[in-house]
Amino acid sequence: YNCAWAGFGGRVMGAAYTFAHKEGHNPMIYRKWVRRSLGNFFENWVGNLFGNVPYNFTTSHMHLHHRLDGGMGDSFYMWDLDRSSAWDFLLFVPRIFSHMVGVSSLAKFWRQRASPLMCKQFYLLLRGVLIFWFVTPGLLYGVTRSPFFLFVVWLQPLLCMTFFLAVVNWGFHAFVHLDENGEQVACVNSLTILDGLDDSFGEDDHMAHHYSPQTWYTKTHEFQAKMHVDIVKYHGSVFKEVSIVELGFLIMFNQFERIAEKHFVDHSRTLSCQQVADMLRSRARVKEIEYDDYLDWLREGGEAKAAKAKLAKAN
């Protein structure tokens, strides 16, 4: 069963994630009668056996991760950690687990429930949490009467997918560079992989995914062309011939010389291999805030305050 659900090279698991991800991004992907009766097939049905809480992409992924582009308050936030440290990665895994089970996202939506949109996301995700934690295991146990079957088919994939997404996100958002105004540079904090080993529907172009999400996966090269000047200027995070899982591990274990030699694409053609390694290592260690300070920020209601400040600025 492990070979069946994970697949060789994790491709079945990756495909299940990819299709659920695409459904979350495309609320009109199915006809109205399908949306009202079955909903998102991979996100809300198949996903129960792949560690995915129903509605997690529709709610948390869209209204936290993409709204904040990985910034403070995101359930996937990681810029309070040293991405070149495997020890810091161990602090990140529980954060992803809290996201996967729905707890952290529910708490974030609840704290911002004054917004009708966020209140709607709270109750939608709450429905998904109840389905995943009560309905799904109840049905499986009712049919099989086997706790072992329940562990292997339902709980184990949750643990595996948690680690998988932690590694993937560790790679996708590993690097931080600030421009002359102190703002994060988009072509650095979300990376692009060219000729990737496991690309599915343009998932490897995470830069386009965040900063031009309307771009269809066959057209991401057009967005790359638009970003070329910035990529050259800031030595953007562009890599080649590597999977995001492999890259995540290479970053985690501080293998920047190997990344520089084999995978980094220097569009400026001005940097030596060692300069690239030093630059990437430095960017992987840049923090927006210290880990303990970020926890204090969360406890003090930083998310709600930031949302109010952003709304006031917009008005």
Regions found by a protein language model. Name each.
Residues 138-144, 156-160, 196:
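Short, conserved, surface-exposed binding loops centered on an aromatic residue
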Residues 8-25, 53-57, 154-182, 202:
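Transmembrane alpha-helical segments that form the membrane-embedded catalytic/substrate-channel core
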Residues 2-4, 154-155, 192-193, 199:
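Intrinsically disordered, low-complexity segments enriched in polar/charged residues with Gly/Pro
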Residues 1-151, 218-219, 224-315:
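Non-catalytic, topology-defining segments of multipass membrane proteins
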Residues 51, 55, 157, 196-197, ...:
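A generic helix-loop boundary/linker signal
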